[in-house]
Amino acid sequence: MPRSLKKGPFVDQHLFVKVARENDKGTKNVIKTWSRRSMIIPDMLGHTIAVHDGRKHIPVFVTESMVGHKLGEFAPTRTFRGHVKDDRKGKRR
């Protein structure tokens, strides 16, 4: 279920302050954050936000189509290495 419209989008306060500071300065430095639960708002457009995936920070460049999604959607936490291929010749004896 989506969040109620009367509540508005959730953005961690420390992340919101960092984005507002960058907007006031007019700079586009990489903003490092651990807040995967924060929603992308229009103020973040054009910024690169480094989202933590549990090991490292993955840089995410925010575009217009990302507004309304969560930051964590763009930094996958699991690495799928693929299934092991069966060795059919070894099993036939």
Swiss-Prot record:
One of its GO terms (biological process) is translation. It comes from Paenarthrobacter aurescens (strain TC1). This is Small ribosomal subunit protein uS19. Protein S19 forms a complex with S13 that binds strongly to the 16S ribosomal RNA. It holds the Pfam family Ribosomal_S19. It comes from the Bacteria. Keywords: Ribonucleoprotein, Ribosomal protein, RNA-binding, rRNA-binding. GO terms for cellular component: cytoplasm; small ribosomal subunit.
